[in-house]
Amino acid sequence: MKFFLDTANVDKIKEFNALGLVDGVTTNPSLIKKEGRDFYEVIKEICSIVEGPVSAEVIALDAEGMVNEAKELVKIAKNVVIKIPMTKEGMKAVNILSKEGIKTNVTLIFSANQALLAAKAGATYVSPFVGRLDDIGQDGLLLISEIMQIFGAYGIETEVIVASVRHPIHVTESAKMGADIATIPFDVLDKLFNHSLTDIGIEKFLADWDAHMKR
């Protein structure tokens, strides 16, 4: 499974990229707003840090506007991927962009039907939101299972990005299902490092070594 960072915080991207853990980055207007910086500047800087795909989202709601924005965004760097909402106009834009060789990430996927439509339109990636489904009492991970089953049955090459990841279980379970990518907030990625027995083990090793050195 590949790990993308779901953030526009350049410092955090640098921190985790230095560990060799960042295969790509996903952003959205809300994340960039938090940084208080120019949209294009942030995307350009992220692309200079990370070699993998960097998703940048369009704002337009009509296909023509999305395509025009996409063509400007891909000028920033070769690894920019255009994030498109799951709407009819969005699918029209994805169809156009895919024929021009521009990679797309269809976002706000909440059903297997939506994922299938996006794949048929030519999406490079689809982003099903597991956490938001959990929020309304549905099983977000069940959606990942359904999408992986359908894509596998038909040999669909569109990659699945597990999004709206809220805790490590989302990562573990989606990895078991064979999801291609999880896009993870840095606070959740931090939690993947942790286990109480690891901490206890380190403390014991250090205590034993300290006792040995005092002999």
Curated annotation (Swiss-Prot):
GO terms for biological process: carbohydrate metabolic process; pentose-phosphate shunt. InterPro entries: Aldolase_TIM (IPR013785), TAL/FSA (IPR001585), Transaldolase_3B (IPR022999), Transaldolase_3B/F6P_aldolase (IPR004731), Transaldolase_AS (IPR018225), TSA/FSA_arc/bac (IPR033919). It is found in: Cytoplasm. One of its GO terms (molecular function) is transaldolase activity. GO terms for cellular component: cytoplasm. Keywords: Cytoplasm, Pentose shunt, Schiff base, Transferase. It catalyses: D-sedoheptulose 7-phosphate + D-glyceraldehyde 3-phosphate = D-erythrose 4-phosphate + beta-D-fructose 6-phosphate. Its EC number is 2.2.1.2. This is Probable transaldolase. The lineage of its organism: Archaea, Methanobacteriati, Methanobacteriota, Methanomada group, Methanococci.
